[in-house]
Amino acid sequence: MRRLLPLLDHFRRDRAGNIAVIFALTLVPMISVAGGGLDYIRATAIRTKLQAAADAASVGSVAKQSPAFIAAGTMSSDGTIAAGVADATNIFNANMSGITGYALNGLNITVSRVNGVVTSNVQFSADVPMMFLGVIGKS
């Protein structure tokens, strides 16, 4: 920071105008690139949290003591396990409570028994609004 202040003072004192014009012209793209990087980091962090919540919901809904596993043991044939879907939804929502900065567009959860095996699939879709790139019209 100490090196930056004399440099900025030099730009301010320069009366030729070339430096100030070039600096002004390059400032907008530089800020846009830096802001885009921050938006990307934020979106990636939210995607990671959503994926972790989906993984926890998928695994937790078919754990040995889960409602889905217990219900699958009482089923006489293969099919969807409603208790598992509800349990997975609760696990996903619990993991994402308190996390902001995204809009969940869709959450598709299936928990079923096929050939005696309990399987779970959790898919989600979400939008993360861009803060810095939104200023220049990018979404």
How should each PLM-predicted stretch be described?
Residues 1-16:
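N-terminal leader/signal peptides at the extreme start of proteins
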Residues 2, 37, 41-49, 56-130:
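Short amphipathic secondary-structure patches
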Residues 11, 19-20, 40:
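N-terminal transmembrane alpha-helices
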Residues 16-28:
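N-terminal signal-anchor/signal peptide hydrophobic helix marking the start
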Residues 18-21, 34, 55:
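Alpha-helical structural signal
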Residues 27-37:
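Single-pass alpha-helical transmembrane signal-anchor segments
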Residues 131-139:
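Short, ordered "entry" segments at domain starts
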